[in-house]
């Protein structure tokens, strides 16, 4: 949007989602009877689009409109049903352009070479250490948790000058357990933003939101913030 000067929005917002449901499905104001007024629509991160949302988008395109889809079929498929991008590419029905050069990291970056190995079904070389990729092996979940906390609170800030809140993001594949997001957030909050009578707190379920916490919005509210916006509360 910075280069084109045009707005970008989610498919739900583009199709003018109606927050009521019909037969258990989300309703959109844009459809075959009320199509989008555009000659071309570009969809980024197409691997995240499930078959139901894609069907709604196709119905809302007017005759003669062009649909340009951008995405990586090797990323995780959508949470909802279908593997739309992969199926479209494999169909040999639509024109496909494969981009092979990585610009986000250097070609020799261990992040890049390790990712390519995993996509090819091979084990990445975990013995090599580089500035952008490190593998730390631990024997228990508790040891992993303590290592993550130590990396965020001490080692990465000391080695690279990172701010634990602004420059570091921890990702976990689970919510529960010693290495799940719930316990990671609790432990990191305890170390990085401890309880202080001068800070406002708000209890929410089993956890506590504290002034100065890093938070992430995970459900869209178009009047306030967008999904994946994060900041300090």
Task: For every predicted segment, state its role.
Residues 1-129:
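ASCE P-loop NTPase helicase motor core
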Residues 73-232:
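Conserved helicase motor core of P-loop NTPases
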């Amino acid at each position: 949007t910075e280069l084109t000067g045009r707005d970008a929005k989610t498919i739900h917002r583009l199709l003018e989602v109606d927050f009521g449901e019909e037969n258990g499905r989300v309703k959109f104001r844009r459809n075959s009877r009320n199509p989008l007024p555009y000659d071309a629509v570009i969809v980024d991160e197409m691997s995240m689009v499930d078959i139901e949302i894609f069907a709604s988008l196709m119905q809302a395109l007017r005759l003669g409109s062009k649909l340009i889809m951008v995405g990586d079929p090797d990323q995780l498929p959508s949470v909802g049903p279908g593997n739309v991008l992969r199926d479209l590419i494999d169909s040999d029905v639509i024109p496909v352009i494969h981009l092979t050069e990585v610009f986000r990291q250097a070609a020799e970056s261990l992040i890049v070479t390790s990712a390519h190995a995993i996509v090819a079904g091979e084990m990445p070389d975990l013995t090599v250490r580089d500035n952008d990729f490190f593998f730390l092996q631990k024997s228990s979940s508790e040891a992993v948790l303590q290592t993550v906390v130590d990396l965020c609170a001490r080692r990465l800030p000391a080695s690279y000058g990172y701010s634990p809140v602004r420059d570091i993001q921890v990702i976990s594949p689970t919510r529960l357990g010693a290495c799940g997001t719930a316990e990671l957030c609790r432990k990191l909050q305890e170390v990085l933003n401890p309880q202080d009578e001068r800070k406002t707190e708000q209890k929410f379920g089993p956890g506590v939101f504290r002034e100065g916490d890093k938070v992430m919005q995970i459900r869209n509210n178009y009047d306030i913030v967008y999904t994946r916006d994060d900041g300090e509360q």
